[in-house]
């Protein structure tokens, strides 16, 4: 038979080893029975008594603990970079007085106002008020050190005066790292330059160039100058542009003719040169012209003068052929081939438009035929209105 003591403690040597290690590590004492074969009846387990046997041989032969993986270290450093530590509170910061009045009744409004000034939370002020006895009629003074700026007062007061309640604070979501904004360079009032709309940049009036009375030369770029009409002679590249005349005429820009060695002509057309194209009002006026019977015609009988000589065509794209039909109807002729129309001594083709005749033939002085020049009237009004002569074709 197996003794009862052997059933209760099948491994007495393990119990003895536990006693030796517990006595050496924590200084605990145990009572032993000498009459038995090493069975120990230990005391009740104390607060610092080892619950499991310590096997020194197992610790000696265990492999060394592996270091944490590199990914965990990277995550740890990344979290530290994402959440910067709060700046340490130094004693050199300005100290401010935070007064909070606790209580109920008419003191509640002042208490709430001073809570906002001090930057403390409602839970911390409520816990402090309850510790004062719960009376609510006692005024108390709270002193704290914190930065003078109001932006950082809320976080500093919460750290200096934590709540006395045992409830754990709710976990706060991680705040993103604020992006550092560049500090603007301080400017002085003498660094600012007043720039008005339409005003050229400073120094543009110092550019060299021929000056024009009334208009700075720098405000008119060279590539912005518009060319003269094709029937006018071009300016010399070495000569300066002529001065601007002071009088306006239907919002057009007129320039005086360049100085020449010969005296200018008596006509006003030679003294004024039109640079800008005609306005929309002038373009809508159409083409004015005069139909005159030529003094020298190809054969007799000569064609007579029509009663209505001044005509206006609204559309400048009307061709010379339409004028020929008009003369055939007015003069009672049989065929259009009997009539020819000329301008400055040059015979006009039927396909030419009146606008082309005016711009390319009438307005060009070099297009005047020497044989037809004496036949053109010299009246002033004829110099501004296109004159077309008609006659019988030989």
Curated annotation (Swiss-Prot):
<dbReference type="GO" id="GO:0045893">
    <property type="term" value="P:positive regulation of DNA-templated transcription"/>
</dbReference>
<comment type="subunit">
    <text>Interacts with LAX1.</text>
</comment>
<dbReference type="GO" id="GO:2000032">
    <property type="term" value="P:regulation of secondary shoot formation"/>
</dbReference>
<feature type="compositionally biased region" description="Low complexity">
    <location>
        <begin position="119"/>
        <end position="131"/>
    </location>
</feature>
<feature type="compositionally biased region" description="Basic residues">
    <location>
        <begin position="8"/>
        <end position="20"/>
    </location>
</feature>
<keyword id="KW-0539">Nucleus</keyword>
<comment type="function">
    <text>Involved in the regulation of shoot branching by controlling axillary meristem (AM) formation. Functions in association with LAX1 to regulate the process of AM formation. Possesses transactivation activity in yeast.</text>
</comment>
<feature type="compositionally biased region" description="Basic and acidic residues">
    <location>
        <begin position="60"/>
        <end position="84"/>
    </location>
</feature>
<feature type="compositionally biased region" description="Low complexity">
    <location>
        <begin position="146"/>
        <end position="155"/>
    </location>
</feature>
<protein>
    <recommendedName>
        <fullName>Protein LAX PANICLE 2</fullName>
    </recommendedName>
</protein>
<feature type="region of interest" description="Disordered">
    <location>
        <begin position="1"/>
        <end position="193"/>
    </location>
</feature>
<dbReference type="InterPro" id="IPR044171">
    <property type="entry name" value="LAX2-like"/>
</dbReference>
<feature type="compositionally biased region" description="Low complexity">
    <location>
        <begin position="90"/>
        <end position="101"/>
    </location>
</feature>
<dbReference type="GO" id="GO:0005634">
    <property type="term" value="C:nucleus"/>
</dbReference>
<feature type="compositionally biased region" description="Pro residues">
    <location>
        <begin position="170"/>
        <end position="185"/>
    </location>
</feature>
<keyword id="KW-0217">Developmental protein</keyword>
